[in-house]
Amino acid sequence: MQEVLNDLFDYSNLKIFQYVEGFKFSLDSILLAEYVKISSKTKNILDLCSGNAAVPLIISTKTKAKIDSFEIQEDIYKLAKKSIVYNKLEHQITVYNADIKDIDNYKKGVKYDIITCNPPYFKVEDSVHINDNEILAIARHELKITLDDIFFAATNHLDDKGEFYLVHRVSRLDEIIITANKFNLNVKNIELIKTKENGKPYLVLVRCIKNSKFGIKINNEKNIGNLKTYKNLFKEDS
């Protein structure tokens, strides 16, 4: 498959390797990376379902914290690795070609302050058509992991009161909240994203805290349809 080196949207000096045809990073990854709240106390971050490392690369512009990332598909992992090396971020970002169910084989006992995830959105049983391209199929459909797998990995590898950030489809928000509660990752904040002023939200960003009290804050819907940058989009939200 032919590769291309692109600008990582408007993040100056960041480049990312992608395939000319097929897998590319999405706006969802940018929104997730921007949504993450990082403090001076943040020591380490884990990114699940990392793709070609768009989320870790963007997060690296906001912190010096160490970032580990896991990507199950070898071809996509290689793109992520090349992007990290090209941007000279090997000292900060480490990517593993592994299933998130096997994190303990690589980082046994390590607990993270923050975990992020831009997962496959679609259940296999609900899908009328699954892409013939295996890479795209695995990236978009729950062929290798489920929501339970994701929340299990997050709760197992988060420090107490650590934060988990997830981007997903609005249509699965009820399932997300139920699953989060099951794994003691109570949802604290919800952001709803739409692309038209009078349109319905299609994306949801959630922030969970491990072993926290119940109570959810839902911020005003954000229309991103005409935005030229997504930097500081969530700056006023808490």
Feature map (PLM): residue ranges:
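SAM-dependent Rossmann-like transferase core, predominantly class I methyltransferases
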Residues: D7-N44, S50-K62, V204-R207, E221
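Short, structurally constrained coil/turn elements
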Residues: D10, L89, N181-N184
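Conserved Class I SAM-dependent methyltransferase catalytic core
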Residues: K15, E21, K144-P201
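SAM/dcSAM-binding transferase cores
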Residues: E197-S238
